[in-house]
Amino acid sequence: MSEEAAYQEDTAVQNTPADALSPVESDSNSALSTPSNKAERDDMKDFDENHEESNNYVEIPKKPASAYVTVSICCLMVAFGGFVFGWDTGTISGFVAQTDFIRRFGMKHHDGTYYLSKVRTGLIVSIFNIGCAIGGIILAKLGDMYGRKMGLIVVVVIYIIGIIIQIASINKWYQYFIGRIISGLGVGGIAVLSPMLISEVSPKHIRGTLVSCYQLMITLGIFLGYCTNYGTKTYTNSVQWRVPLGLGFAWALFMIGGMTFVPESPRYLVEVGKIEEAKRSIALSNKVSADDPAVMAEVEVVQATVEAEKLAGNASWGEIFSTKTKVFQRLIMGAMIQSLQQLTGDNYFFYYGTTVFTAVGLEDSFETSIVLGIVNFASTFVGIFLVERYGRRRCLLWGAASMTACMVVFASVGVTRLWPNGKKNGSSKGAGNCMIVFTCFYLFCFATTWAPIPFVVNSETFPLRVKSKCMAIAQACNWIWGFLIGFFTPFISGAIDFYYGYVFMGCLVFSYFYVFFFVPETKGLTLEEVNTLWEEGVLPWKSPSWVPPNKRGTDYNADDLMHDDQPFYKKMFGKK
């Protein structure tokens, strides 16, 4: 027996335990799944053996990890769009502290020194988010018009144009400001199209992992951006900021070159009638022959979905408000998840990191950034594993709970020990050390859960017909909150100091309850199956037990997953 055949046989008979967050999700598992689905959705324990013979659906078999090297490399190249965004984020945080940048784009004191006001700093840094929000909504439709690949190439070119304008800026801050907006337009398009393309070419059982690579690339870009700023800080001329910008230009060109080797989305190819190309794309992603019956079966499922959407006519913006197919409910969920990602307070930690680290003797803000960047980047590797091992819901719930605990400790120690009674003397080294530890704990929890998973959830939630529109709006909510937090944090934190942490603590508590009651589990499902799950109205806290229609046994009770008359506290902690 070959290694691959043995692997598939072991997978078919493997007993995977149900790792549940609460008794509700554990006990709601029922005898519903077939052997193949059981391996994919380990929240379910039993299955109907008699159903195996009647199930005619041909499914692409799961293969050893080595079989997915090609598709993984392709998805990493698409995810490199996250690196472009992260590079910009990591470098701009250092630019506003560099002497040449301040001299060129700041204002002059009476004594001849230069400074950047809070308003100008906030605008230069945060206007990028507004550009991203607009770009995501306007440019995301390029993926529907010309394909995901070509759409990505176009938005990267727009990003490059913005970089050129910034590099060419001499001493007019508004020229640099305009360049930031244009670069933001490009990154906004990247943030929608990159996760979208990855989700549509990935095999379903590693889709969450591969989409999470987008966030991994963001953290890598941020970290290397910090390192580059550290390397150029000793210069006294425009090398300080023009070299990092020039490297950003080079990274964008690298991505454009790499995109030529990436397969197009099979769902887009089916939509435009290129069936043979769609079969080759699916075959490449799953390491099988294009003539494999399972490939044709998947193409037929996509075709059926596309044909149903075509019968309904062209998708309009008004259609996203439809409640009949649960599109509006999905949009609200996607927008909330993206908004709550910002409201978890990660940017608050990066803003206060310099202050806290200074209190214990680390006075170099560039060194502080590198420390935080290392923790953020290294932790994301753990998140890539967790998203497929434990699922989307469970990771988000764990993340919200653990970050709440970290935020409570961080804010409380800051208020009562580091700056007692609002006195900013930073006299307690023990308090500072404690806050550093919990800053790192917080970043670990964020990077493994709430950093990557909102991108995963949004990339697989919406039907193909309105996917680009819904993802653009959801992502725009993220950018807008990013702008608001980035712009107003210096003013708010200056007024209430570490009490600001309690605001984010409240947002994290709300996030926990929101995820439990409104975010369904989609691990191990195809994109078409996710669509069916939503249309059937399955309750999110019962969704781990849901089984696709073509895999159900004779005793499957769909109604049981759509109704729950228990009080909310029993839904969360009680047994059925």
Curated annotation (Swiss-Prot):
> Biased-composition ranges for Polar residues?
25-37
Gene symbol here is HXT4
The residue ranges for the Extracellular side of the membrane come to: 88-122, 171-180, 229-242, 364-369, 416-437, 497
SUPFAM superfamilies documented for this protein: MFS general substrate transporter (SSF103473)
Q: Which NCBIfam families match?
A: SP
Q: Which residues does the annotated region (Disordered) include?
A: 1-56
Name of the protein described by the UniProt record: Low-affinity glucose transporter HXT4
Q: Which InterPro entries match?
A: MFS_dom, MFS_sugar_transport-like, MFS_Sugar_Transporters, MFS_trans_sf, Sugar/inositol_transpt, Sugar_transporter_CS
Query: What's known about how it's activated or inhibited?
Result: Xylose uptake is strongly inhibited by glucose.
Species of provenance: Saccharomyces cerevisiae (strain ATCC 204508 / S288c)
